């Protein structure tokens, strides 16, 4: 089982969609692409202002975060018992989140060192306009709208991607969701909490809160969102790569419009919950 692909286990509909019709996938993907301008227009009305944030940390801090993630991952490998309930899919969920904690430790240190606002620079700004409820409501609606508008494209690509991998002769890990029936009781509850709450918050804080501002500054808004989405998808392996890449683009767009991490984590967590619910049905 590919441990990296389990760090976003619920965002792997490709494994469940392998037997679905590529024709249906193409139709859904085409529908999703045709809806994109409408979705963009609606989201622009929700959040018309262009928000700019300047990150003072650099790529040396990113390298430090990667090294810290490697260390905490290896420590988890060595220290977590290789027996129930820490074996199997739960282990595959825990280890990547330990790596995320290591990376976020460096990200928090970098923000406190370089930014006047400290840790809030990672996508948790204070609301200075006074309209807290209105601002939060618009951000939540934007996240929900982006998720709903992106679902046809994501699901369509999920149907198509296994056929592409098969054509290329490349294998993908299909075990992330299919191994979940092995979990019962507290292990199953822990796995759901990790997948729907913990992983979205940690991963969005690192990828969209820490990496994306730096990449946007150096490679433009479009280039930065694309590159971070590629990195985001690459850690999950070939099996779910393209669907997760599309999800990463959606989450990057949410962060770009709101400059907040919690709407990204909201969309991420809801999507994970949706896919898990469908897989369990």
Where on the chain are the PLM-derived regions?
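N-terminal, membrane-interfacial amphipathic/helix-forming hydrophobic leader that caps
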Residues: 1-123, 127-141, 273-281
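Transmembrane helix-loop-helix hairpins at the membrane interface
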Residues: 13, 26-40, 148-160, 164-281
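Juxtamembrane helix-loop-helix connectors linking adjacent transmembrane helices
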Residues: 78-98, 110-199, 217
């Amino acid at each position: 089982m590919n441990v990296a692909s389990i760090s976003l286990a619920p965002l792997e509909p490709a494994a469940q969609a392998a037997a679905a019709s590529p024709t249906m996938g193409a139709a859904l993907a085409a529908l999703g692409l045709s809806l994109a301008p409408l979705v963009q227009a609606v989201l622009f009305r929700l959040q018309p202002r262009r928000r700019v944030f300047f990150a003072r940390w650099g790529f040396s801090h990113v390298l430090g975060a990667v090294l810290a993630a490697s260390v905490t991952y290896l420590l988890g490998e060595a220290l977590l018992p290789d027996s129930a309930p820490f074996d199997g899919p739960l282990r595959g969920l825990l280890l990547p989140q330990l790596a995320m904690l290591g990376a976020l430790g460096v990200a928090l240190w970098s923000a406190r060192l370089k930014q006047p606002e400290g840790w809030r620079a990672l996508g948790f700004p204070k609301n200075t306009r006074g309209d807290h409820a209105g601002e939060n409501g618009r951000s939540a609606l934007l996240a929900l709208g982006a998720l709903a508008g992106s679902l046809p494209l994501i699901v369509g690509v999920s149907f198509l991607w296994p056929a592409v991998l098969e054509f290329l002769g490349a294998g993908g890990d299909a075990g992330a969701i299919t191994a979940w029936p092995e979990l019962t009781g507290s292990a199953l509850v822990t796995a759901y909490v990790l997948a729907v709450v913990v992983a979205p918050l940690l991963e969005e804080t690192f990828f969209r809160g820490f990496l994306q501002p730096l990449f946007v500054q150096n490679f433009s808004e479009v280039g930065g969102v694309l590159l971070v989405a590629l990195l985001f998808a690459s850690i999950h392996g070939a099996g779910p790569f393209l669907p997760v890449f599309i999800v990463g683009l959606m989450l990057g767009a949410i962060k770009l419009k709101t400059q907040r991490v919690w709407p990204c984590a909201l969309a991420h967590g809801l999507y994970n919950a949706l896919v898990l619910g469908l897989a369990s049905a």
